[in-house]
């Protein structure tokens, strides 16, 4: 059963329009909705996920014209790192807006992260974002970071690019990273999962109309069933160990559960967590309720183990770095 704190949090999510003195839960999104307006809203709400811990540094870099930044904890070399694919339906979001989220993973795992601003649709439809993602990984390799010292991580639309990049790297015979973590990855842009229908009302963060519009922006004239657009339909053999999260009540739940099943059938080491009563990308909300904190701890331990770091402290340990976030 979901914790009392998580249920209260979900209640606030569902009724947050009332806190803004609005009667309507949400505004419909269609092709007439200004994309920049949606992006501005994301940037304004970024602070909700927390601020950078003391001593963290943000170092901007340019990767063949792609804006990116290193997010580093104090006194940490770049020998091992996370490559983070930010979410936002492939249309909104940014590295800057995700600093608070990524900082939690960085703090808990003890390694830095490279976060990059891949090209967003509709200005940059497929394959621009995927090409930028491959370039970001190649940049890390060119910087001398070994593949076995890199873990991919992505949320929502960034989870899509995380898997699509793995497939592209495999096709190009580029060594794969040590592992990958996704939160509520959008793996099927055909939107055929049962949860896309059954959870349309229970999902308080993702909306079917928005997903359809974002899909059209990203795919352009391309078939949404192409494996590098919808990794669910790709050849998953040979992928590194995966740690996957989804909420039971979210629109994209089945995008994760179906990919997990197909990856296992392909012989991939998969750990799947479907949080009961949870919502889209719920681990990013740590430490606001127990389920998110537990997931965050598991993710950080996975990163440390894949990178052969010291095992992460058990939940509720006095050494738990999330206790100070």
Where are these regions (language model features)?
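Alpha/beta-hydrolase superfamily serine-hydrolase fold, recognizing
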Residues: 59-325
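A glycine/proline-hinged amphipathic helix-loop "lid/cap" segment
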Residues: 1-71, 308-325
């Amino acid at each position: 059963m979901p914790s009392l704190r998580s249920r209260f949090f979900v209640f606030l999510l569902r009724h947050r329009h009332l806190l803004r003195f609005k009667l309507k839960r949400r505004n419909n999104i269609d092709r007439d909705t200004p994309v920049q307006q949606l992006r501005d809203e994301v940037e304004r709400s970024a602070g909700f996920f927390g601020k950078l811990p003391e001593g963290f540094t943000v170092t901007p870099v340019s990767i063949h014209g792609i804006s990116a930044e290193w997010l580093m904890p104090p006194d940490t070399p770049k020998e091992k790192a996370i490559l983070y694919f930010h979410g936002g339906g492939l249309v909104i979001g940014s590295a800057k807006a995700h600093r608070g989220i990524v900082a939690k993973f960085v703090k808990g795992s003890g390694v830095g992260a490279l976060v990059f601003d891949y090209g967003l649709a509709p200005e940059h439809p497929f394959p621009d974002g995927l090409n930028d993602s491959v370039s970001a990984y190649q940049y890390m390799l060119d910087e001398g970071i070994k593949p076995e010292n890199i873990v991919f991580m992505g949320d929502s639309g960034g989870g899509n690019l995380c898997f699509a990049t793995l497939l592209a790297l495999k096709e190009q015979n580029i060594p794969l990273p040590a592992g990958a973590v996704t939160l509520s990855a959008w793996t099927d842009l055909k939107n055929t999962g049962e949860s896309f229908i059954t959870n349309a009302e229970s999902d308080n963060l993702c909306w079917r109309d928005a997903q359809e519009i974002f899909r059209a922006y990203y795919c352009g004239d391309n078939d949404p069933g192409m494996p590098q657009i919808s990794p669910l339909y790709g050849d998953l053999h040979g992928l590194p160990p995966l740690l996957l999260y989804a909420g039971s009540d979210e629109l994209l739940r089945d995008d994760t559960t179906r990919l997990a099943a197909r990856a296992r059938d392909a012989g991939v080491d998969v750990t799947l967590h479907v949080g009961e009563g949870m919502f889209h990308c719920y681990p990013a909300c740590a430490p606001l309720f127990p389920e998110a904190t537990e997931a965050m701890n598991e993710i950080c331990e996975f990163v440390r183990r894949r990178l052969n770091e010291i095992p992460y402290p058990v939940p509720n340990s006095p050494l738990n770095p999330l206790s100070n976030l």
